[in-house]
């Protein structure tokens, strides 16, 4: 039997291929960044051909580093940045335009139009989602309205819509020569075009948004054999797992029981709680979404708090303000001061997501005095991540009725121990970092491995999970609530900036 499982992890800033063994340990990894394209304020694009090229490159590099071939892999899974929207020509394989990235806000006029006609939550009961620039359905509508020839091709079935999972799968399984046009339930649930209860494309939503059914992919489980990869160097390997990145991290953290939750700290931050086989409708500004579907089992659902900007704020301080040269330098800089000097940063670069859902909010730095230094800004940036996570945790506790016993964490920012301690302090709950922090890729590997019998069951996966470090809260309650009150005040200042 093949010794390993592979995972394609196609994220907002880079593409990676990671090879895992049966214990969930990394055998080999390769990574390559792609360009972020900003044609106008609020617009964010990726080049689909660059993403495809980089994905193929990192697959080859990771295999070469460990001296592996396709025959060493039992299966491959895909995890991807969600909501990022593509439309490509079925006959040529060429994209009709650049991909509209999840944080792109060009659909704000469409959102306002639909909100005026029936309120921000008019489709929430069916889709689990509020009207927002975040979701893929209206991004597709924008492409159909604004890219020459797109609408006619989509209606004729000559243009194919997909999120990044669909784009990669179609290309890897043959492309113009019979590639499989599929998406899994988790990615489909981020389009605003499916009925959560049935996990099927919904005619009412398609009609409301003006989306032709002919361009849509087939919806499949998150763990199932979709076909064989037909491109080198993975030719002949089964493609057998597919999950949006945050759902993949939930699986990678083995949150298989209702009430289990994880928070991923990446470009944005995403807190997901497994709610079992029934969707829980949020009254506190969270999203109701698919968690995963393993083979023929019933789909599992989750509540999600999506935060647009956390790690991206650190990048902004590095790239735009030049406060430091590389991201890890933010921690010693922030540690050089005792507190934030009463400075608060609300990073509403793309509006505010959960639990506020304010597309008209924009970034604010509040509380500045002559006392404030670059170190205070660095500290305020890290703290803003923790405050945003608390906003979401409070909403999640309100919706679920379950108090968070501990927060399982993953993602790039968990290496920042100042942030992890402050997170525990501001939540007044333990924060737990697992030994394996690459849980997004691991979740995709788990989904693929389960589909082909590489792992027998969920207990095999649970046995792989272990704690690296736990941070206990140590901040006095009075201090914690004083800080949080100031944060809430700063958040209010960010609202209603865009007319």
Swiss-Prot record:
ATP binds at residues 12-14, 267, 311, 315, 412. It is an enzyme of class 2 (transferase). InterPro entries: ATPase_NBD, Carb_kinase_FGGY, Carb_kinase_FGGY_CS, FGGY_C, FGGY_N, Glycerol_kin. Gene3D superfamilies: 3.30.420.40. Keywords: ATP-binding, Glycerol metabolism, Kinase, Nucleotide-binding, Transferase. It catalyses: glycerol + ATP = sn-glycerol 3-phosphate + ADP + H(+). ADP binds at residues 12, 16, 267, 311, 412, 416. It comes from the Bacteria. GO terms for molecular function: ATP binding; glycerol kinase activity. One of its GO terms (biological process) is glycerol metabolic process. Sn-glycerol 3-phosphate binds at residues 12, 82-83, 134, 245. Inhibited by fructose 1,6-bisphosphate (FBP). One of its GO terms (cellular component) is cytosol. Its EC number is 2.7.1.30. Glycerol binds at residues 82-83, 134, 245-246. Pathway: Polyol metabolism; glycerol degradation via glycerol kinase pathway; sn-glycerol 3-phosphate from glycerol: step 1/1. Belongs to the FGGY kinase family. Key enzyme in the regulation of glycerol uptake and metabolism. Catalyzes the phosphorylation of glycerol to yield sn-glycerol 3-phosphate. This is Glycerol kinase. The lineage of its organism: Bacteria, Pseudomonadati, Pseudomonadota, Alphaproteobacteria, Acetobacterales.
